[in-house]
């Protein structure tokens, strides 16, 4: 087969336009290129963590965001700090818009600390400070 006139053919003369062509051999030979690979047992174990397993940094970030939205009921602005808390949990600092204003430099921002245990459950939260968005702030 010639490469001329067929922009989908590669140098081996194989037509790449048909993305449903079978790839590989063995048990995965039936999987097509446009299908995602099957999850392995280790992938499923990570995505289905038991409630007693410890969480990592990225899970702590997700849980802190969810907790801020649920517990504090203000518009979520962002997570500005996450750190391990004595090896048995996480300390996170989030910012929430407590009052919108015009101009937005006059918005009131609340900075809250949310603590999580090693499994990601919220163990407490505290308002650290409030400030206007336009005020110069020293970062944590």
Swiss-Prot record:
Induction: Expressed from a single promoter upstream of gvpA; most transcripts stop at the gvpA terminator, with low read-through into downstream gvpC-gvpN-gvpO. Expression starts in early stationary phase and is maximal in stationary phase. Highly expressed in 25% salt, poorly expressed in 15% salt, no gas vesicles are formed at 15% salt. The keyword Hydrolase does not apply. Residues 1-61 are annotated as: Disordered. One of its GO terms (cellular component) is cytoplasm. One of its GO terms (biological process) is gas vesicle organization. A minor component of the gas vesicle (GV), may play a role in transcription and/or RNA stability and/or in GV assembly. Gas vesicles are small, hollow, gas filled protein structures found in some microorganisms. They allow positioning of halobacteria at the optimal depth for growth in the poorly aerated shallow brine pools of their habitat. This is Gas vesicle protein O. It comes from Haloferax mediterranei (strain ATCC 33500 / DSM 1411 / JCM 8866 / NBRC 14739 / NCIMB 2177 / R-4). The gene is gvpO.
